[in-house]
């Protein structure tokens, strides 16, 4: 989809250009295919309602362990997905189809995408036309894998960079005429902190060019690994699964000055024990901010001289990492300390999870028939 075609179609009525007559109705879909969690959307909410119709599903497929007895798994299923897989993980071999936002297991990805389609189109009586978010600088191999998997499930596919879709999802079209409204699509710098990567994107009203995009392989998963290492260094007798480490991070994450008083219960040789992890959580999360700030400087330096000062006033943090306490304030403080003039860093929304899918659905509703990959 070209820059011009996206701009032209997004601002049109949802009907767009007349599509060829088909026996099936069209079902536009927006999909955020995440490393840990995905969101699929078939209906837009009323602007400003604060609600969304997205279906959130953990990105995981479960295969039964060899020799599993009948009646152990629901419906004696040969494969489970999402929450069903996690609820029965004791009896399953869990496979995450994606790593760092890129498909690693093509068959698991196809199965998972098929499961997502069933959630919004269980009878498959419609032509499902799906726009899917991709990492900011996904290479050709990553795009080809995703396209192959998606085309095996959906009737039409479009792949669009995730930060652009997040900006579009955040945009409130009803407020565009308000003088104080900062349009996230007009001139902004989006920072999308995911599990596998952190993506940066300059958005200036059109489809981003390659030079407007940057992606680093550092996100929530790296924070988990660092936190695990720090806990092991301080408590050698403690051996925790990464899922438990991730749970501590998600509950207690913060950046800035070290905090104490974060005590958690862990098993040591089967016995309960409480340990203090406040300093370790802060150090792990601050490492993420170090990486983000260094990359932000690189992206800001690439912005055009006529746009950079207003761009600095519209830096938006989204993705799972946006839930880290004080992350927007800490990044803004570091930019000020480095000499940037009046930067303004803010969080996208209280609930970031549907933004990419909302933006994807807006594109899907506006796309012309000849723009879909079949």
Residue map of PLM features:
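Periplasmic peptidoglycan-binding/anchoring modules of Gram-negative envelope and division proteins
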Residues: 294
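Repeat-based blade/solenoid architectures
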Residues: 354-356
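A structural feature that tracks compact, well-ordered secondary-structure segments
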Residues: 199-201
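N-terminal structural subdomain of ketosynthase/condensing enzymes
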Residues: 68-83
């Amino acid at each position: 989809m070209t820059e011009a075609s996206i701009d032209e179609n997004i601002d049109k009525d949802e009907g767009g250009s007349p599509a060829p007559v088909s026996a099936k109705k069209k079902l536009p879909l927006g999909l955020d295919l995440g490393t840990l969690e995905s969101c699929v959307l078939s209906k837009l909410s009323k602007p400003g309602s604060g609600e969304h119709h997205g279906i959130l599903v953990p990105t995981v497929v479960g295969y039964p362990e060899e020799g599993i007895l009948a009646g152990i798994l629901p419906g004696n299923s040969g494969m489970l997905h999402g929450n069903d897989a996690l609820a029965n993980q004791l009896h399953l071999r869990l496979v995450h189809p994606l790593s760092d936002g890129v498909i690693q297991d093509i068959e698991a990805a196809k199965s998972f995408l098929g499961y997502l389609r069933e959630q919004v189109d269980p009878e498959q009586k419609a032509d499902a036309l799906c726009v899917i978010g991709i990492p900011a600088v996904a290479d050709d191999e990553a795009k080809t894998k995703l396209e192959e998997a998606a085309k095996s499930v959906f009737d039409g596919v479009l792949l669009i960079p995730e930060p652009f879709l997040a900006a579009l999802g955040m945009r409130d079209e009803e407020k565009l005429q308000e003088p104080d409204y900062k349009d996230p699509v007009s001139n902004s710098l989006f920072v999308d902190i995911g599990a596998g990567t952190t993506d940066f994107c300059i958005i200036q009203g059109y489809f981003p060019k390659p030079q407007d995009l940057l992606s680093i392989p550092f996100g929530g998963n790296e924070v988990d690994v660092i936190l695990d290492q720090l806990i092991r260094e301080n408590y050698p007798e403690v051996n925790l699964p990464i899922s438990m480490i991730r749970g501590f991070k998600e509950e207690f994450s913060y950046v800035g000055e070290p905090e104490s008083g974060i005590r958690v219960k862990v098993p040591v040789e089967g016995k309960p024990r409480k340990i203090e992890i406040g300093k370790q959580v802060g150090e792990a999360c601050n490492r993420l901010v170090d990486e983000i700030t260094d990359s932000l400087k690189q992206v800001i330096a690439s912005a055009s001289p006529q746009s950079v000062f207003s761009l600095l006033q519209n830096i938006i943090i989204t993705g799972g990492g946006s839930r880290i306490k004080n992350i927007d304030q800490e990044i803004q403080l570091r930019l000020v300390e480095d000499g940037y003039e009046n930067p303004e860093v803010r969080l996208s929304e209280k609930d970031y999870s549907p933004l990419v899918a909302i933006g994807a659905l807006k594109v899907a509703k506006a796309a012309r028939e000849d723009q879909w990959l079949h």
